[in-house]
């Protein structure tokens, strides 16, 4: 394809040379001038450029391939035969001319990997000799195989490189033989052969083969592979429990070592057996804590600061004034409650009011309390007053009426609003809660009562507390048994 074809495709009119004779002459002169030869580009590709000639033409400067082709000659390859085995001949390509390879005996390049096991070889007389000698030395009347069968077995082992499954599959001399019988006979003959040749050979014990042990191993492996999913899960759970016991034993030993390191000096006259029990360890731990607290106390009191002493006196006076004011309000409230609950009859004598001197003496004799103690005392007195008021309201109800109406006197503070009795059932930590649920399932009881009446909820709560107590006792017992096992 030339540039004129491209112009025709793009519908471009080329420049005409008829109206301009000078230009045509110049073009003719230019066409007569020889064009420089362009290398590195195909002629057809160069013709497609048209008037848009590139300023620089990329030319390859490397002559490596040309030089390589000119300097080297192709090496000859010959298709020759080689012997893979004495019975099989194959062909392959070998580098070199046929004349050079004719006088050589070609061998396979993989012949070096064809290694055979070196098994003992013996004649029938030698076999009878060392077998009789071994039987005489061992004083055993064990039956032996014939020489032909032993030779047949050794030929199979030599051919299949002691691959026992293949040897057993190809063994046709006596089909009643098992794989264990074949292996036992092979190692027995080898051991007796080397004992006759070199009795002091240290490799003789490695030729011992136990047929019974191999049978037991295969039976155990068969049972292991035929386990069900439940048996596998049970074994994994037992392994986890054993690891937990091991970790608990290690932790107990570490705690014991850390506690023994806290001792200041070893007591030579004391018996170590008293610290091997849990009671002895608890006693030792309490003694160490008491010694540590006793040593923290200063031997002598620090010097007294007069400014701090004055501030303490001001604080004590302020506390006394607040306490007096509080007691005054409490007495006034108590009198109002007594007037409401037990009104004074006209004929009853009035109680003697406390005299000012007695009141002052009682206030001076009152102990000094801090802010926290005063708040606790106020809370206790308020609860006592509420309980007395509730008891006064409920004294007109009998026990049957209280039970039928569901009226009870709570000692604890309840949240405001309506709630379910089942929501007040005791709950525990997740680890303890799971154990409690398992115990309830063993007893055939639901986790939450179906009819949560007041009596049922009370008995259920009491049952849960007893279960937790029993679980705690069981945990302590397991810990003591683990300690006994560690001591043993």
UniProtKB/Swiss-Prot annotation:
Polar residues compositional bias, start-end: 13-37
Highest taxon of source: Eukaryota
InterPro entries referenced in this protein's UniProt entry, alphabetically: DAMP1_SANT-like, Swc4/Dmap1
Stretches the record annotates as Disordered: 1-37, 290-387
Single GO MF annotation: transcription corepressor activity
Localization of this protein: Nucleus
Keyword line: Activator, Chromatin regulator, DNA damage, DNA repair, Nucleus, Transcription, Transcription regulation
Residue runs in coiled coils: none
Keyword Nucleus belongs to the record: yes
Biological process according to GO: chromatin remodeling; chromosome organization; DNA repair; negative regulation of transcription by RNA polymerase II
Biased composition (Low complexity): 309-325
SANT domain: residues covered: 137-190
One GO term describing the cellular component: Swr1 complex
Entry keyword annotation includes DNA damage: yes
Pfam families per the UniProt record, alphabetical: SANT_DAMP1_like
Residue ranges with Basic and acidic residues bias: 330-341
Family designation: Belongs to the SWC4 family.
Assembly mode: Component of the SWR1 chromatin-remodeling complex and of the NuA4 histone acetyltransferase complex.
Role according to the record: Component of the SWR1 complex which mediates the ATP-dependent exchange of histone H2A for the H2A variant HZT1 leading to transcriptional regulation of selected genes by chromatin remodeling. Component of the NuA4 histone acetyltransferase complex which is involved in transcriptional activation of selected genes principally by acetylation of nucleosomal histone H4 and H2A. The NuA4 complex is also involved in DNA repair.
Protein name as it appears in the record: SWR1-complex protein 4
Provenance organism: Eremothecium gossypii (strain ATCC 10895 / CBS 109.51 / FGSC 9923 / NRRL Y-1056)
């Amino acid at each position: 394809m030339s540039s004129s074809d491209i112009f025709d495709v793009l519908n471009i009119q080329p420049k005409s040379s008829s109206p301009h004779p000078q230009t045509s002459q110049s073009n003719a002169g230019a066409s007569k001038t020889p064009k420089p030869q362009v290398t590195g580009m195909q002629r057809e590709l160069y013709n497609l450029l048209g008037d848009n000639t590139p300023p620089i033409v990329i030319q390859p400067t490397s002559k490596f391939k040309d030089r390589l082709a000119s300097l080297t000659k192709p090496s000859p390859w010959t298709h020759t035969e080689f012997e893979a085995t004495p019975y099989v001949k194959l062909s392959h390509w070998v580098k070199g001319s046929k004349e050079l390879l004719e006088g050589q005996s070609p061998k396979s390049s993989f012949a070096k990997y064809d290694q055979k096991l070196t098994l003992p070889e013996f004649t029938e007389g030698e076999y009878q000799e060392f077998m009789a000698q071994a039987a005489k030395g061992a004083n055993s009347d064990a039956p032996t195989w014939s020489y032909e069968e032993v030779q047949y077995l050794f030929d199979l082992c030599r051919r299949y490189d002691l691959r026992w499954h293949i040897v057993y599959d190809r063994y046709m001399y006596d089909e009643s033989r098992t794989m264990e019988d074949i292996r036992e006979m092979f190692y027995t003959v080898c051991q007796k052969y080397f004992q006759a040749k070199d009795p002091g050979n240290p490799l003789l014990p490695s030729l011992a083969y136990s047929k019974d042990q191999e049978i037991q191993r295969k039976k155990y492996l068969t049972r292991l592979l035929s386990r069900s999913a439940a048996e596998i899960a049970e074994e994994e759970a037992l392994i986890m429990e054993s690891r937990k016991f091991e970790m608990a034993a290690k932790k107990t030993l570490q705690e014991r070592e850390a506690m023994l390191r806290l001792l200041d000096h070893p007591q030579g006259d004391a018996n170590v057996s008293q610290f091997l029990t849990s009671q002895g360890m608890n006693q030792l731990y309490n003694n160490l804590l008491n010694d540590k607290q006793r040593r923290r106390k200063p031997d002598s009191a620090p010097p007294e600061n007069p400014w701090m002493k004055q501030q303490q006196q001001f604080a004590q006076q302020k506390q006394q004034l607040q306490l007096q004011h509080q007691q005054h309000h409490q007495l006034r409230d108590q009198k109002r409650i007594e007037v409401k609950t037990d009104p004074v009859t006209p004929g009853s004598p009035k109680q003697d009011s406390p005299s000012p001197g007695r009141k002052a003496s009682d206030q001076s004799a009152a102990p000094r309390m801090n802010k926290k103690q005063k708040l606790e005392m106020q809370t206790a007195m308020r609860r006592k007053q509420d309980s007395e008021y509730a008891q006064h309201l409920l004294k007109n109800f009998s026990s049957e009426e209280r039970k039928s109406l569901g009226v009870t006197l709570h000692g604890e503070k309840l949240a405001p609003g309506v709630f379910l009795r089942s929501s007040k059932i005791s709950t525990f930590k997740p680890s303890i809660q799971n154990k409690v649920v398992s115990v309830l399932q063993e007893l055939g009881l639901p986790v939450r009562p179906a009819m949560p009446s007041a009596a049922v909820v009370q008995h259920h709560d009491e049952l849960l507390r007893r279960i937790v107590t029993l679980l705690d006792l069981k945990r302590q017992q397991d810990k003591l048994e683990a300690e006994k096992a560690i001591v043993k």
